């Protein structure tokens, strides 16, 4: 059968609807967003809260967000660049750091709500699958839904590290264990030991030992900062364990200290800003150039 050219008639163009701008730009999955945002129709002022997780090249962003008619409102947020304050100075975008960010945003949100003592979460992490359950005589746990945006839901992805951290931190995040590292598809069981290894940076320590044996030059280039700080593979688990304790002790937000004051920044920027000339200065500049040109001609 010969190929027929598709003709777009006037009826096609008159009925064509352009997608939303953020859909055209490939930024928002509206099919997903509609289901994450739609509130219960029989309840008044009960927004759905989303645990929004996004990754950049050097940072992890975790926010608890609710949708309103005027726009999304961020209830609280946590970032991987805050982790050095808790002792995690390097590897701020790996799976273990993602777990720590999830734990931080959970503890920070519960502290803000005054539920941090009611819902302590999982204090002794063993890698088991656990959901936060409601206490008998008290408020229900704070419920959030994971919002991964356009990221792929690959088994073992870092986004589920943030989910696990938030769940262990005391938030109620509905989920199943089949996307965590250590999930066996055939047996349909979770290897808790493997998941615990990822939470405490065991996979990083394992890679350090492997590189040290096989390729010492590569080890020195990749783990240069670890060598300077005299951190060995045996110390990695302790670093993350201490960080989790520190996060639970004080999850409150503290702004980063600026190197200079606003006045100093302003004075520095003025050094490189070109000043606008007055009319008299421009005329004098032109007259000078004319005089120089005439002098060359003579």
Curated annotation (Swiss-Prot):
Pfam families reported for this sequence: Ribosomal_L18_c (PF14204), Ribosomal_L5e (PF17144)
Similarity comment: family membership: Belongs to the universal ribosomal protein uL18 family.
Subunit structure of this chain's protein: Component of the large ribosomal subunit. Mature ribosomes consist of a small (40S) and a large (60S) subunit. The 40S subunit contains about 32 different proteins and 1 molecule of RNA (18S). The 60S subunit contains 45 different proteins and 3 molecules of RNA (25S, 5.8S and 5S).
One biological process term in Gene Ontology: ribosomal large subunit assembly
InterPro entries: Rbsml_uL18_euk, Ribosomal_uL18_C_euk
Source species, domain of life: Eukaryota
First-listed, main subcellular location of the protein, grouped into a coarse class: cytoplasm
Function: Component of the ribosome, a large ribonucleoprotein complex responsible for the synthesis of proteins in the cell. The small ribosomal subunit (SSU) binds messenger RNAs (mRNAs) and translates the encoded message by selecting cognate aminoacyl-transfer RNA (tRNA) molecules. The large subunit (LSU) contains the ribosomal catalytic site termed the peptidyl transferase center (PTC), which catalyzes the formation of peptide bonds, thereby polymerizing the amino acids delivered by tRNAs into a polypeptide chain.
Localization, UniProt: Cytoplasm
Name of the protein in question: Large ribosomal subunit protein uL18
Gene Ontology CC: cytosolic large ribosomal subunit
Assigned keywords, A-Z: Cytoplasm, Ribonucleoprotein, Ribosomal protein
GO MF terms held by the record: 5S rRNA binding; structural constituent of ribosome
